[in-house]
Amino acid sequence: MNTRFLDACWGKPVDTVPVWLMRQAGRYLPDYMRVRSKCTFLELCKTPELATEVTVQPVDILGVDAAILFSDILTPIEPMGMELDFTPGPVFAKPIRTMADVEALKIPKMETDVPYVLDAVKLLRKELATKVPLIGFGGAPFTLACYMVEGKGSKDFAALKKMMYADPEVYAALMDKITTMDMEYLNAQIKAGAQAIQIFDTWGGMLSPADYERYVLPYTQRLINGLDRTNIPVIHFVKGAGTMLEIVKQAGGDVMGLDWHVNLGKARDILGDMAVQGNLDPTVLFAPNEIIEREVKRVLDENAGRPGLIFNLGHGILPTVPPEKAIFMVDCVHRLSRK
């Protein structure tokens, strides 16, 4: 098996910088669209054989150094008692607004409530045995709460922030319950065979540093501390957190995910020995090849040869990116960083 990705997570020497892409199993790949055309998004998430097929596609097509389980961060929320649909974005029929709503949420039994996730992990470990490691993942408690309270995607998640400020007891009870669920969900993935875990906090960066520290940090910290992490690296990605890396670092984990709004070298100075993942602007993949190569080189140069770099985009690959551009980017990373 290619262990570059895991070695880099632990800060060990590698022959070339490992690379994978957030949303690498996705709509930009014709092979993915072929599978997706036959089922709904939720059916794809809930059918282990199909989830396995699309998870492996980018490993074979792009030559990336890790696979990430095909699923959705909201998958474990449905069995908590919230009706979920995708139209095409996530929509909850009845958002959480009151303490009674929070009390009605149940903690799922992972083996019986989301068996398809764990079955996909087990299938993937067999499928990827001679290829690359498998990353399991989940949403951070705050980002999950954003969707559960708002009921759908939003630019500002005003309903959640209103709860945070005006109903702190309800907010705390909700975050506490989500954190407990999240811990059990990610530990179930680890038990099923996930070799690394990524925690996505897509909306954590919309808060001020003081609010992040007060309303988010304690829950993410508790989540990470509660994971069965023996030899399992944890990647913590908070989009938009470049101005508060010192605070986010306190949550724990082994690798800090970075978006493109921060200079990777300066981030490394702040984070010390902690490994990092990132941080190319996803829209660079629409550029001519020479620009892609220039930008890959810039990120590598900012790292200045320090161990513990996993190359990635600063957020998910966009659906309209030509696959050959992603292939070229992966090749650039390997070629330009080869020892």
Curated annotation (Swiss-Prot):
Signal peptide: none annotated. It is found in: Cytoplasm. It catalyses: uroporphyrinogen III + 4 H(+) = coproporphyrinogen III + 4 CO2. Pathway: Porphyrin-containing compound metabolism; protoporphyrin-IX biosynthesis; coproporphyrinogen-III from 5-aminolevulinate: step 4/4. One of its GO terms (molecular function) is uroporphyrinogen decarboxylase activity. Transmembrane segments: none annotated. It holds the Pfam family URO-D. GO terms for cellular component: cytosol. The record marks D72 as: Transition state stabilizer. Keywords: Cytoplasm, Decarboxylase, Lyase, Porphyrin biosynthesis. Its EC number is 4.1.1.37. Substrate binds at R23, Q24, A25, G26, R27, D72, Y147, T202, H315. SUPFAM superfamilies: UROD/MetE-like (SSF51726). One of its GO terms (biological process) is protoporphyrinogen IX biosynthetic process from glutamate. Belongs to the uroporphyrinogen decarboxylase family. Catalyzes the decarboxylation of four acetate groups of uroporphyrinogen-III to yield coproporphyrinogen-III. HAMAP family: URO_D (MF_00218). Homodimer. This is Uroporphyrinogen decarboxylase.
